[in-house]
Amino acid sequence: MIYRKIIWGILYVTLMLFDTHRAQECEEMTDLNFKDSLAGTSLKVRLLLYTRADPSCGQLLSHQEPFSNSQFNVSSVTTFLIHGYRPTGSPPVWMKQFVEFLLNRRDMNVIVVDWNRGATNMNYWQVVKNTRKVANNLTDLIQKMKDNGANLSSIHMIGVSLGAHISGFTGANFNGEIGRITALDPAGPEFNGRPPEDRLDPSDALFVEALHTDMDALGYRNLLGHIDYYANGGADQPGCPKTILSGSEYFKCDHQRSVFLYMSSVNGSCPIIAYPCESYTDFQDGTCMDCGKFKSAGCPIFGYDSVRWRDTLVQLEQTRTYFQTNKASPFCKVGYKVDIVSWNQKTHWGYLTIKLSNGTEETQVELNHKSLKFERFQETSVLAQFERDIQPVKKITLKFCPRKGLRPRKKLRLLHIRLTPLQNHLRPLCRYDLLLEESKDVTFKPIPCEDSNF
């Protein structure tokens, strides 16, 4: 008995020593604080390598000899994760999970570019100046990778905020031969209105994509890539605070949402379809559902898998796309194109609420982005995006609310209504001859539409 205890004791001590040694070898992102931001920090770039061999353990790469004593495989795909401005000095809360999702998706090198010393500074303009220096540092590493047999087309740079422009500067140093740049809400301040050489642009990589979530504040407003996604119009993300009373979340929620949206695409939680469109209003009106220029591939899927549309996108002029999301994961919504023909003698204006039910579950959307116009025998179209998929749809409830200030009470007479699913190939749902009284629910059982057109 005593020998067994001795053996177990030796094993326990050995394991503890191994864990301690491993903890000493594993590197974490630089963790600073607000005092550091007030004092300002000098730039120091640290490169942390993560692989499937030990996905939770970051290896600090030597700038001089990055491939010695490391698990770096230059023949594999390499993804760089580059953070942005860090006014409080703390590491990004999403970084570890982002690395995990990437390594779960495929075998690759993930390099976290830790430039927290240099990004932590109350002087934003000084941080902007540092972006060129970070890009030069990464250029040196990538050149070493290339010299050791790496293919530039196998490099994917994911840049958040200022990190997006760092990716662009790095790609420009290789004449756009880097495989892919993903820009997550690229920084706007100090970059809006700048010429292509002073910001990210499509020539910086073989494929450049940009996601916009805070273009009215911290993000960039205009097109930057071969394809640009404007989530929920590119500003004011659902679930984010609308007033400063919510504290720091008011400033960072919209901007940071870009990261979580892209992470969800890497994790494959649910696909988000991006519709090419000239404006968010046109998108909401349901006039941009045609993706014929992508032929059999259909509309692009936002995120990690968008590379499937690369060959078509790089041949087109810069493509602007829109989509809507839920306020939390799963972010994808389920879309229907709604077409209505009314037969009132007079023109009516108002808003619609649509509820779908399968008998046990319900999902509802309020179409209130603008007052809809209903003219006699004229088709009114709008896009309805629901929080989740309800199948089979057994009941539909409509509510019509006239535009404020219009009296007496209105009744909207529908010759027919048609709901066409956008995410699947189910047959459109119809109903004929309905009377909607002001602010009253009208529930009916839909039927398969008689033909493909009204």
UniProtKB/Swiss-Prot annotation:
Its EC number is 3.1.1.-. It catalyses: 1-hexadecanoyl-2-(9Z-octadecenoyl)-sn-glycero-3-phosphate + H2O = 2-(9Z-octadecenoyl)-sn-glycero-3-phosphate + hexadecanoate + H(+). The active site is at 161 (nucleophile), 185 (charge relay system), 255 (charge relay system). It is found in: Secreted; Cell membrane. Residues 1-23 form the signal peptide. GO terms for molecular function: carboxylic ester hydrolase activity; phospholipase activity. GO terms for cellular component: extracellular space; plasma membrane. Glycans are attached at residues 73, 137, 151, 267, 358. GO terms for biological process: lipid catabolic process. Disulfide bonds join 240-253, 277-288, 291-299, 430-449. It comes from the Eukaryota. The keyword Nucleotidyltransferase does not apply. Hydrolyzes specifically phosphatidic acid (PA) to produce 2-acyl lysophosphatidic acid (LPA; a potent bioactive lipid mediator) and fatty acid. Does not hydrolyze other phospholipids, like phosphatidylserine (PS), phosphatidylcholine (PC) and phosphatidylethanolamine (PE) or triacylglycerol (TG). Belongs to the AB hydrolase superfamily. Lipase family. This is Lipase member H. The lineage of its organism: Eukaryota, Metazoa, Chordata, Craniata, Vertebrata. The gene is liph.
